Design a protein with these regions (language model features):
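Hydrophobic transmembrane alpha-helices
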Residues: 1-16, 57-65, 130-251
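N-terminal signal-anchor/initial transmembrane insertion module
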Residues: 1-63
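Hydrophobic alpha-helical transmembrane segments of polytopic
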Residues: 3, 7-10, 43-51, 71-78, ...
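Juxtamembrane interfacial secondary-structure elements that flank transmembrane helices
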Residues: 16-31, 80-94, 118-127, 156-166, ...
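Juxtamembrane helix-capping/reentrant segments at transmembrane boundaries
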Residues: 27-47, 93-107, 174-181, 242-249
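Hydrophobic alpha-helical transmembrane segments in multi-pass integral membrane proteins
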Residues: 59, 109-127, 191-199
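Hydrophobic alpha-helical segments and helix pairs
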Residues: 66-119
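Non-cytosolic membrane-interface motifs at loop->transmembrane helix junctions
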Residues: 95-101, 128-137
């Protein structure tokens, strides 16, 4: 009788346990089907939209006037350059980004354009004195505008050099060798920040200074991260000589 009960118990256990599986091991549930990935959009498309937004918003908000025209001209040239670089120069290492970034970036740049234009309309220091665009600018303002232009040209130069490193279509990071990169990892950001500093000095706009400060903080963060990546990747390469993120000997 005991033998029959033992055989019956074994048969029941064998029916519920797969061969080779321990009795104490629970069965795993079947894998769930993969969820649909969040919508994504090409980097180039996002850049085109986020640079087009301030080009449209600033002139729409800016009032007619010599000083407002000066501020609008510098603003328009800067973002027109960015847009042209996006279309014809930049080589993106990544293909897509989340679609939500499109609305976030366009809102940021479009909102900044509206705020800076409104602030310059409200408190432009030369609005009542200037009769013609550039005609009666002070020497100090002319120096600021000239320095702004130099930073814009140097920023373009660094972007052209970076694009030349991927002329073969590769997305692999390579060591930049142009003179601005000898001691600084991200001189393109350095000149970008410089152009906004001189724009803020020329316009004397608190809103422009706020936009400059926020942008500089973000670019400094990106530069530090990039320097760490490059130091790991190119630590044994003699061609890599950058020691700082943005400013030689300082940051």
């Amino acid at each position: 009788m005991a033998l029959r009960l033992l055989v019956a118990a074994f048969a029941v256990a064998h029916a519920f346990v797969s061969p080779g599986r321990a009795l104490s091991t629970p069965r795993r549930p079947p894998p769930r089907p993969a969820t649909t990935m969040a919508a994504r959009i090409p980097w180039r498309t996002v850049f085109v939209c986020e640079y087009t937004a301030p080009l449209l918003v600033f002139p729409a908000v800016s009032k007619a006037g010599p000083f407002s025209t000066l501020a609008s001209t510098l603003w328009t040239v800067h973002f027109a350059k960015r847009l042209a670089e996006t279309l014809f120069v930049h080589k993106f290492s990544k293909g897509t980004m989340p679609l939500t970034n499109l609305f976030k970036n366009c809102g940021y740049y479009g909102g900044a354009a509206a705020l800076v234009a409104w602030d310059i309309n409200r408190s432009g220091p030369y609005g009542a004195q200037l009769a013609k665009l550039f005609a009666q600018l002070s020497t100090k303002t002319k120096v600021f505008v000239g320095a702004w232009a130099i930073c814009e040209v140097l920023n373009l130069y660094t972007h052209l050099h970076l694009a030349s490193l991927r002329s073969d279509g590769s997305r692999e990071a390579k060591i930049p060798t142009a003179w601005p990169f000898r001691r600084v990892c991200s001189p393109n950001y350095s000149f970008e920040i410089g152009s906004w500093i001189f724009y803020s000095l020329a316009t004397r706009s608190p809103a422009a200074w706020a936009f400059t400060t926020l942008g500089a903080w973000q670019m400094a963060t990106w530069s530090k991260q990039k320097l760490k990546r490059y130091k790991r990747k190119f630590k044994d390469e003699e061609a890599f000589t950058a020691t700082h993120a943005l400013v030689p000997g300082v940051f």
